[in-house]
């Protein structure tokens, strides 16, 4: 199937009598309720369920193996190839399926808040609530922009169309396929709305580096003096909590680009976790869930329609989608200058990493490539032990290119703009999980504040004898003994053994990066 034929098929779909284009938020909410796709909550948000797929389905994600990208993609378990033949046949079937629908919903908008680098996109949805979701998550065009909008990438989403693995070359009924040549994302068999968000992020992670822009899975905020901070970290490290600062304005909570102009948000909204959400813990998120917001897999009281954020009956991965302007303390448009400070967050359950360390350029590249944190594996008896987990560049499921490409760009930009990089451990202190305790949040906030205001630049440091990290000896508001992890352990020999064990896990994980420079390995990693 040629690109021309693909465009003809799209044109027919978009010009069919069933296509509802660029409906407003109230119109979409009406459609959701009329079509029985979701419920209205007590705060005016729409609540919808995603069925059996309550999270991303990485084994069902494919990139079409086309001549123009075949030698650029880092093929493997993350970037699984699928043939053009399989894609073309499935695409044709999905289009025929959607043509028969009574209604389709189309959103036109952008990815990328910097007008110089934004990607015009359109999303064709089988579900009205999915269209409301993308309306809130991506960047909404003005009426004037809409008149000249020409989409460069299209998502076609048909959750109720199920693939046949034997015929379609998929691994299950669900599929998320990206064709860079035809500029199409094809999604079916899954109702999880996050697939649309992350597909565009994966595309931007391919397109932006081609323009010498580093795409990043991080949150970002800016201080009153215009100083920009980035927060990288996997789930459970405190990225959302620590980047929400009343004295700093939010640029974005999840996806950013770093160009020669500075930092920009890729999105126009937030997709926040809301398990155990409360007004006391996270007032910004709680208050943003109003009319037009979308709740995913949150249990709602049948009578009062009040959301129960503590109920994880459907999944722990409950989510809320809302536009950036639903939060008070933000920058709009979501662009800012070059980062002054970069924070890598890790929740080290082995309790051996320092609570804060200063990183050299090589160490920053090493820890960026490593993307380390811990996850806790539970047993039926409730006995838990920490497991090291590594997610390259703090976002491996979304990186189509070789990881070293992103790391090299980070190193270049750190050097060019003199950004200060810190590794912050929000995990355990005084022993590993089960012996020690979680790092005091007040101490972590004080350490990050000291990093942001430049105090750590002039603080005396000591080199960690196993990880080679420069550890500050004094941080205002933090007891000195907390800063050196070994001092918080009663059993010093046990600390050393555990630290060497983690250092070896770092080294073992790093063996997969065969294309990185020797400097990153020799100057960036553990020294023992």
From Swiss-Prot:
Its EC number is 4.1.1.49. Coiled coil: none annotated. Binds 1 Mn(2+) ion per subunit. Its cofactor is Mn(2+). The keyword Hydrolase does not apply. Keywords: ATP-binding, Cytoplasm, Decarboxylase, Gluconeogenesis, Lyase, Manganese, Metal-binding, Nucleotide-binding. ATP binds at residues 198, 217, 233-241, 282, 319, 444. Mn(2+) binds at residues 198, 217, 254. Substrate binds at residues 56, 192, 198, 319. It catalyses: oxaloacetate + ATP = phosphoenolpyruvate + ADP + CO2. CDD domains: PEPCK_ATP (cd00484). It is found in: Cytoplasm. One of its GO terms (biological process) is gluconeogenesis. Its main location: cytoplasm. One of its GO terms (cellular component) is cytosol. Pathway: Carbohydrate biosynthesis; gluconeogenesis. The keyword Signal does not apply. It holds the Pfam family PEPCK_ATP. PROSITE patterns: PEPCK_ATP. One of its GO terms (molecular function) is phosphoenolpyruvate carboxykinase (ATP) activity. Involved in the gluconeogenesis. Catalyzes the conversion of oxaloacetate (OAA) to phosphoenolpyruvate (PEP) through direct phosphoryl transfer between the nucleoside triphosphate and OAA. Belongs to the phosphoenolpyruvate carboxykinase (ATP) family. This is Phosphoenolpyruvate carboxykinase (ATP). It comes from Bacillus cereus (strain ATCC 14579 / DSM 31 / CCUG 7414 / JCM 2152 / NBRC 15305 / NCIMB 9373 / NCTC 2599 / NRRL B-3711). The lineage of its organism: Bacteria, Bacillati, Bacillota, Bacilli, Bacillales. The gene is pckA.
């Amino acid at each position: 199937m040629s690109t021309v034929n693909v465009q003809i098929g799209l044109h027919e779909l978009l010009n069919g009598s069933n296509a509802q284009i660029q409906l407003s938020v109230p119109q979409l909410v009406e459609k959701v309720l009329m079509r029985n796709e979701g419920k209205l909550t007590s705060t005016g948000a729409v609540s919808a369920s995603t069925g059996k797929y309550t999270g991303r389905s990485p084994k069902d994600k494919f990139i079409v193996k086309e001549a123009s990208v075949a030698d650029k993609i880092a093929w493997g378990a993350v970037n699984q190839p699928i043939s053009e033949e399989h894609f073309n046949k499935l695409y044709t079937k999905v289009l025929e399926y959607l043509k028969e629908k009574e209604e389709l919903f189309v959103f036109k908008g952008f990815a990328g808040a910097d007008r110089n680098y934004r990607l015009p996109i359109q999303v064709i949805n089988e579900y009205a609530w999915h269209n409301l979701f993308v309306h809130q998550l991506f960047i909404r065009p003005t009426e004037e922009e809409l008149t000249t909008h020409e989409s460069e990438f299209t998502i076609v989403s048909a959750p109720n169309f199920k693939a046949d693995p034997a015929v379609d070359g998929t691994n299950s009924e669900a599929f998320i396929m990206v064709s860079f040549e035809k500029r199409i994302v094809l999604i079916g068999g899954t109702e999880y709305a996050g697939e649309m968000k992350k597909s565009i992020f994966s595309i931007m992670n391919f397109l932006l580096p081609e323009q010498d822009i580093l795409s990043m899975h991080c949150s970002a905020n800016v201080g009153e003096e215009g100083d920009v901070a980035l927060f990288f970290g996997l789930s459970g490290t405190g990225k959302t909590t620590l980047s929400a600062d009343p004295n700093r304005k939010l640029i974005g909570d999840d996806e950013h680009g770093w160009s020669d102009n500075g930092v920009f948000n890729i999105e126009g909204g937030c997709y926040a976790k809301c398990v155990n959400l409360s007004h006391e813990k996270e007032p910004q998120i709680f208050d943003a869930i109003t009319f037009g917001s979308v709740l995913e897999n949150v249990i709602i009281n049948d009578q009062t329609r009040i959301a129960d954020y503590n109920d994880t009956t459907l999944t722990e991965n409950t989510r809320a989608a809302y536009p950036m302007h639903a939060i008070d303390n933000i920058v709009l448009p979501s662009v800012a200058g070059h980062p002054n400070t970069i924070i890598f967050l890790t929740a080290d359950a082995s309790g051996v990493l320092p609570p804060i360390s200063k990183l050299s350029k090589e160490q920053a590249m090493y820890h960026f490539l490593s993307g380390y944190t811990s996850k806790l594996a539970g047993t039926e008896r409730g006995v838990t032990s920490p497991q090291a987990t590594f997610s390259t560049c703090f976002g491996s499921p979304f990186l189509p290119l070789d990881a070293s490409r992103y790391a090299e760009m980070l190193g270049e930009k750190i050097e060019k703009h003199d950004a200060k990089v810190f590794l912050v451990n929000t995990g355990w202190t005084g022993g590993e999980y089960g012996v020690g305790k979680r790092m005091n949040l007040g101490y972590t906030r004080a350490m990050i504040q000291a990093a942001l205001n430049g105090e750590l630049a002039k603080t005396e440091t000591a080199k960690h004898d196993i990880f080679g990290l420069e550890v500050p000896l004094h941080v205002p508001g933090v007891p000195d003994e907390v800063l050196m992890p070994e001092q918080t352990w009663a059993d010093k020999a046990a600390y050393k053994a555990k630290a060497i064990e983690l250092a070896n896990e770092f080294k073992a994980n790093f063996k997969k990066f065969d294309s990185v420079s020797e400097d990153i390995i020799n100057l960036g990693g553990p020294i023992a």
